[in-house]
């Protein structure tokens, strides 16, 4: 059927010309020119797709002859048919019939060689779109490769890729190798569909010339493939195809971004560029707040972000991670080589922690080094290797274990290189011999090797490291650090006895409590006893699990935590009915578990492992059950201690309160121009996080691979939990929120709550009221509550704990009012509060929230801390002030001075005075620690929120009580300055920048800059003469949580970054040198890769890295989002009035600093891929920022910054995004990518524009293909 464009008469003329040429054997060129004139006179647009289809259809196979091929080739040469369309028409006809017609196959490849590499004429031709659509209709490329947009550039890419693929399959088929491929057959037609007996007979009767031609054809096909791979245009097109084509038969190649030398940032592997890891480690060691997020997950994302941004190998990334973890331990004056032996050999008892107080101890620091860090590494390796799970899930041999990716090899190399840091791993000479024997025993135990002669003298600790790592790698636990195996020598026999079935005698139990388990099997054995053993055995297991295995069993710590959380939620019996909770029957067992996990270090360890939401979900049912019943039943523990439901409830409830900032003063919510950044932790929030994690876990290949590490004997319920399931807890929380937000509602006389309040007041002030009755009138407006000294209220107070908590705010209000009016003395008030807290320790939470809210409301007159009515700070207040000044000396921050009569006139708000007076009545021991750690952070934040010098006064009172805590308390007090003074925060940030960059050294340490200058010797390092000056980074880590409005930090950090860049340029680039670098031979304005700029660029990257870390640590995801959406666009729009200093180098360096700052901040918050939960927010914010960028480039937005800064920022940002975070580009709107690429081309950034399009996926693949052709044509 004739093409529609041709009239019948014209069609007949063309047919006649073809037949005449074949019959008369005319010159093909003469025939082609004559045909061109005929078509032109008929008004046919050339080249003509319809003519190409007609010619190919006419020739194959009825008129197939050598002359026909010559006519076709000349038709292409004189441009009357599109070359690529002819090739597309020939491919499905010739290649499948190559064995029947080897000559045709040869001629087809000759046409490929001549015309398959010329794309520019096609792209510029007016019929480009029509031609490519015709090719798609013929070869069905859109359907084959999933090209949805059907852009001509995308079809062109698919066509080139299909040609190479067809040639490759044909060559493999000729050599009999096609069956060895994964699909066993070609994706394309490789044999004729109309093969008949004649064809087979002809195939059998091939002569030697025929065979030789086939062999020559195979050789030519391979040469053509090689040419496609070497040609400048087609090689880039093929690379683009392999990067974006979604097909199981196309292996995705690694992405290598092509970035112009004028726009690529100078990336270095300087160790200082890993500084964010050190800051992160210090930040997670702050124990004042339990984090709902997992430190392991956050560290995983951080390391991946830095590895991508620094363009380093995984070996360098993991080595930097290990060294940062080691520095964390050493900054706390804990020598790692001592710490292991401290718990093993008990010979270094003289070693002491650097600072005493309610702060993380040795075990927590080692948890970061030996548990959190290895788990983060395991996550990274599992992400890489999880891609093989689905492919080998049906394999009985678990072949995935044999596939080692780059991450795993990088880990092994980094561990091997740690041997260069022998000083960190070598024990003191005094214990060298014992240490070597310990190392040998550890190797023998882990490896299962026995030594017949018992001699270990020739084994060293370094060998222990190597042996342990090899063994643990083979088991794929990935939890072995260089010296982890050493602690396993401690009383290994006690765990061996358990595994052999020995009963848990008291002596064996004590040994197991103090000796960490060495394997998951041992913990599973304990779990089995806890679920099936007797009551005494269950209690023994609870003590064992909360002992050394939890605190120092770093290789199995994550498993112990999960087992404990699971045991806190025992399943209900099948025959349970009614409202009675089955948890009551497990009271002694649960109490031991709850007490065991209450220490500061333990809660911190749970937080580091991200188990806080799961723990909250386990604690809420316990609180609901034990708080709802009357305490008529008591239980006796094996220690002889008598407990009631109130005791179990108080322990569980105070532990639950510590999991979020329940004491957060309302002041932090109502002051400032903006609300607090990020979600405010609450019971609902913790349950939401728990439900989401459990619902999502196990659905991704990475999670399924991670589950291989976990125990199979436990099955955690994934059913969602909501607050509605706990009505009494929900009622208390609603009252708690009301108490924090407003004054108490009126209490009705004669109500049940009124009677409970009366009974509690009678109990609290029984001694004070022996002389008669006393009226305590609360300020809330409730009726007068009378207490009588003669009433015995003990029977009346056998009430559910929730009922007592409901009445507690009214009790406190009445007591505080009575004290304010003089009806109660301060000492009597403190004594009464202590009686209430002893009766039900859970009321401490109510005291904290009530007193905090009352201080915030400011309705109470201050009281004089004169030593008569209230305790006096006079003994050491001046000393405390001096030491605060000493701590802040390096920052240049001014400390408010007390007036001359300040000591004698020291006052505190009445609620704060009552709370601090209560706390100093406690005796510090293990029994009260779990309750004081609830009050301590609240007291600290409450005092910090009050005017100066409330915090020094509180600190003075506590240092008088606990002198060994003085360093901790004074350091905490120094943070108050930053809570009240925004300028002090800015000065501290400035100190962080100048000290890290070594710009204005205030000490020999600061002159070198880097991590050591920023973080110094850690928190509270002590020398002779008391606590030392705090390094600015450590101080900022400790104070940023108390900054009321963190939104201003983005602008200040940005300003400090710009100032630092100017200082760097002034110091590193003299004006004369800068002028010489203004023009480089490649035509770009600035030469980033020049040697003269390398040092400056390293410092600029370090400054940007510091700034990004501070933004992320200070405000998390929301603050980074504000930086990208608001702060940066506002900065570029604003006029800064800067001069073109140093030949324009300062503006350029500022642009690159901003680019790295923006990319790194975003990578910290969102992650570099989609595995990070926060990555769901990334596309919207990134689109807004790129839309702003494109609009400014198109002239729709006027900029106020230096043009060189803007140009450097745009090219730098795009370069880093394409090279380091290519996954981001795939999430951006295709049209924005195309517009941005077009603007970059206008700046002569052709390669960068191309790299951006190449990273844009299928949506920009067509535009990238066309740009490849145009760019190569220009060159």
From Swiss-Prot:
Gene disruption: observed consequences: No visible phenotype.
Residue spans of biased composition, Low complexity class: 772-791
Chain's role: Component of the Mediator complex, a coactivator involved in the regulated transcription of nearly all RNA polymerase II-dependent genes. Mediator functions as a bridge to convey information from gene-specific regulatory proteins to the basal RNA polymerase II transcription machinery. The Mediator complex, having a compact conformation in its free form, is recruited to promoters by direct interactions with regulatory proteins and serves for the assembly of a functional preinitiation complex with RNA polymerase II and the general transcription factors.
Gene Ontology BP terms: phenylpropanoid metabolic process; regulation of phenylpropanoid metabolic process
Subunit structure: Component of the Mediator complex.
Gene Ontology, cellular component aspect: mediator complex; membrane
Keywords: Nucleus, Phenylpropanoid metabolism, Repressor, Transcription, Transcription regulation
Listed InterPro entries: MED33A/B
Family to which the UniProt record says this protein belongs: Belongs to the Mediator complex subunit 33 family.
Documented effect of changing residue 361 to H: Partial reversion back to wild-type phenotype
Effect of residue 357 to S: In ref4-3; Semidominant dwarfing and decreased accumulation of phenylpropanoids. Reduced phenotype. No effect
Protein name (Swiss-Prot/TrEMBL): Mediator of RNA polymerase II transcription subunit 33B
Annotated source species: Arabidopsis thaliana (Mouse-ear cress)
Nucleus recorded as keyword: yes
Positions of region (Disordered): 772-792
Subcellular location as annotated: Nucleus
Tissue: Ubiquitous.
Annotated phenotype, changing residue 873 to L: Reversion back to wild-type phenotype
């Amino acid at each position: 059927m004739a093409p529609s464009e041709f009239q019948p008469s014209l069609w007949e003329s063309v047919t006649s010309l073809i037949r005449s040429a074949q019959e008369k054997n005319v010159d093909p060129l003469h025939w082609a020119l004559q045909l061109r004139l005929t078509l032109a006179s008929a008004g046919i647009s050339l080249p003509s797709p319809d003519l190409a289809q007609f010619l190919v259809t006419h020739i194959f196979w009825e008129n197939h002859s050598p002359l026909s091929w010559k006519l076709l080739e000349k038709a292409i040469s004189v441009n009357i048919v599109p070359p690529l369309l002819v090739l597309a028409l020939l491919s499905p006809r010739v290649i499948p019939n190559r064995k029947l017609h080897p000559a045709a196959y040869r001629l087809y490849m000759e046409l490929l060689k001549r015309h398959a590499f010329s794309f520019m004429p096609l792209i510029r031709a007016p019929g480009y779109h029509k031609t490519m659509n015709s090719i798609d209709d013929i070869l069905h490329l859109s359907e084959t490769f999933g090209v949805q947009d059907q852009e001509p550039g995308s079809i062109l890419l698919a066509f080139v890729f299909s040609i190479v693929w067809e040639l490759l399959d044909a060559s493999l088929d000729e050599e009999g190798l096609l069956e060895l491929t994964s699909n066993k057959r070609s994706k394309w037609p490789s044999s004729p569909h109309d093969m008949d007996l004649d064809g087979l007979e002809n195939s059998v009767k091939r002569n030697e010339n025929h065979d030789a031609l086939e062999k020559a054809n195979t050789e030519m096909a391979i040469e053509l493939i090689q040419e496609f791979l070497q040609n400048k245009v087609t090689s880039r097109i093929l690379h683009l195809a392999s990067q974006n084509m979604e097909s199981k038969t196309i292996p995705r190649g690694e992405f290598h971004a092509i970035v112009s030398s004028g726009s690529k940032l100078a990336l270095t592997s300087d160790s200082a560029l890993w500084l964010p890891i050190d800051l992160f480690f210090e930040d997670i060691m702050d124990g004042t707040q339990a984090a709902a997020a997992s430190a392991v997950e956050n560290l995983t994302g951080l390391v991946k972000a830095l590895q991508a941004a620094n363009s380093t190998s995984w070996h360098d990334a993991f080595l930097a991670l290990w060294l940062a973890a080691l520095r964390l331990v050493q900054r706390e004056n804990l020598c790692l080589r001592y710490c292991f032996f401290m718990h093993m050999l008990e010979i270094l008892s003289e070693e002491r922690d650097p600072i005493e107080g309610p702060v993380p101890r040795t075990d927590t620091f080692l948890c970061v080094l030996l548990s959190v860090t290895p788990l983060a590494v395991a996550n990274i390796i599992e992400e890489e290797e999880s891609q093989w799970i689905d492919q080998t899930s049906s394999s009985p041999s678990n072949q995935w274990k044999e596939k080692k990716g780059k991450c795993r090899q990088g880990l092994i190399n980094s561990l091997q290189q740690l041997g260069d840091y022998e000083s960190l791993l070598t024990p003191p000479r005094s214990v060298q011999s014992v240490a070597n024997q310990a190392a040998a025993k550890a190797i023998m135990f882990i490896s299962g090797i026995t030594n017949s002669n018992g001699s270990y003298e020739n084994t060293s600790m370094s060998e222990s490291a190597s042996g342990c790592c090899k063994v643990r790698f083979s088991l794929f636990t990935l939890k072995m650090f260089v010296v982890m195996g050493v602690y396993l020598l401690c009383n290994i026999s006690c765990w061996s006895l358990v595994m052999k079935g020995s009963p848990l005698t008291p002596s064996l139990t004590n040994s197991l409590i103090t000796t960490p388990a060495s394997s998951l099997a041992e913990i599973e054995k304990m779990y089995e006893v806890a679920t099936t053993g007797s009551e005494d055995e269950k209690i023994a297991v609870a003590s064992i699990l909360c002992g050394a295995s939890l605190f120092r069993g770093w290789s199995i710590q994550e498993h112990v935590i999960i087992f404990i959380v699971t045991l806190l939620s025992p399943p209900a019996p099948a025959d349970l009915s009614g409202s009675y909770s089955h948890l009551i029957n497990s009271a002694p067992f649960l109490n031991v578990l709850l007490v065991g996990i209450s220490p500061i270090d333990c809660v911190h360890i749970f937080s580091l492992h991200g188990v806080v939401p799961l723990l909250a979900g386990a604690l809420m049912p316990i609180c609901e059950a034990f708080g709802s019943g009357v305490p008529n039943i008591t239980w006796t523990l094996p220690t002889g201690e008598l407990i009631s439901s109130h005791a179990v409830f108080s322990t569980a409830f105070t532990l639950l309160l510590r999991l979020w900032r329940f004491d957060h003063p309302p002041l932090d919510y109502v002051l400032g121009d903006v609300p607090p950044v990020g979600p405010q932790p609450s019971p609902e929030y913790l349950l939401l996080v728990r439900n989401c994690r459990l619902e999502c876990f196990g659905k991704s290949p990475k999670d399924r691979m991670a589950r291989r590490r976990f125990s199979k004997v436990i099955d955690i319920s994934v059913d969602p939990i909501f607050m509605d399931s706990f009505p009494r807890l929900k009622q208390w929380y609603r009252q708690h929120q009301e108490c924090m937000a407003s004054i108490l509602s009126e209490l009705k006389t004669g109500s049940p709550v009124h009677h409970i309040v009366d009974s509690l007041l009678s109990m609290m002030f029984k001694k004070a009221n022996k002389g008669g009755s006393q009226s305590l009138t609360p300020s809330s407006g409730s009726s007068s509550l009378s207490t009588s000294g003669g009433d015995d209220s003990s029977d009346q107070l056998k009430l559910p704990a929730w009922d007592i908590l409901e009445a507690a705010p009214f009790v406190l209000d009445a007591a505080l009012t009575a004290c304010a009016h003089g009806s109660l003395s301060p000492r009597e008030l403190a004594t009464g509060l202590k009686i209430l807290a002893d009766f039900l320790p859970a009321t401490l939470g109510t005291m904290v929230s009530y007193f905090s809210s009352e201080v915030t409301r400011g309705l109470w007159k201050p009281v004089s801390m004169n030593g008569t009515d209230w305790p006096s700070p006079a003994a050491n207040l001046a000393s405390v002030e001096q030491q605060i000044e000493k701590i802040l000396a390096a920052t240049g921050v001014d400390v408010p001075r007390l007036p001359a009569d300040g000591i004698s006139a020291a006052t505190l708000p009445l609620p704060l005075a009552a709370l601090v007076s209560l706390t100093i009545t406690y005796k510090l021991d293990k029994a009260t620690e779990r309750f004081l750690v609830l009050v301590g952070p609240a007291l600290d934040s409450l005092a910090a929120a009050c005017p100066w010098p409330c915090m020094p006064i509180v600190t003075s009172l506590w240092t008088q009580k606990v002198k060994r805590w003085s360093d901790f308390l004074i350091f905490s007090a120094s943070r108050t300055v930053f809570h009240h003074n925004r300028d002090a925060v800015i000065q501290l940030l400035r100190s962080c920048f100048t000290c890290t960059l070594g710009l204005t050294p205030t000490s020999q340490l600061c002159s070198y800059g880097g991590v050591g200058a920023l973080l110094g010797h850690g928190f509270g390092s002590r020398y002779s003469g008391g606590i030392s000056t705090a390094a600015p980074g450590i101080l900022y880590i400790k104070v940023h949580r108390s900054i009321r409005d963190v939104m201003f930090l983005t602008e200040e950090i940005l300003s400090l970054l710009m100032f630092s860049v100017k200082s760097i340029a002034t110091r590193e680039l003299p004006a004369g040198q800068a002028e010489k670098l203004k023009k480089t031979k490649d035509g770009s304005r600035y030469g980033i890769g020049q040697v003269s700029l390398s040092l400056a660029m390293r410092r600029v990257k370090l400054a940007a890295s510091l700034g990004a870390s501070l933004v992320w640590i200070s405000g998390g995801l929301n603050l980074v989002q504000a930086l990208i959406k608001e702060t940066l666009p506002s900065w570029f729009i604003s006029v800064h009035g800067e001069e073109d200093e140093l030949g324009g180098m300062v503006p350029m360096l500022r642009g690159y600093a901003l680019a790295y700052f923006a990319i790194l901040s975003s990578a910290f918050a969102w992650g570099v891929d989609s595995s990070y939960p926060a990555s769901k927010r990334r596309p919207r914010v990134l689109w807004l920022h790129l839309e702003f960028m494109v609009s400014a480039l198109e002239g729709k937005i006027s900029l106020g910054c230096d043009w060189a800064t803007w140009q450097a920022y745009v090219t730098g940002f795009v370069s880093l995004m394409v090279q380091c975070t290519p996954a981001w580009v795939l999430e951006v709107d295709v049209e924005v990518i195309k517009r941005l690429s077009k603007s970059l081309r206008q700046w002569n950034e052709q390669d960068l524009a191309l790299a951006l399009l190449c990273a844009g996926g299928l949506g920009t693949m067509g535009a990238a293909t066309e740009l490849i052709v145009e760019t190569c044509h220009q060159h």
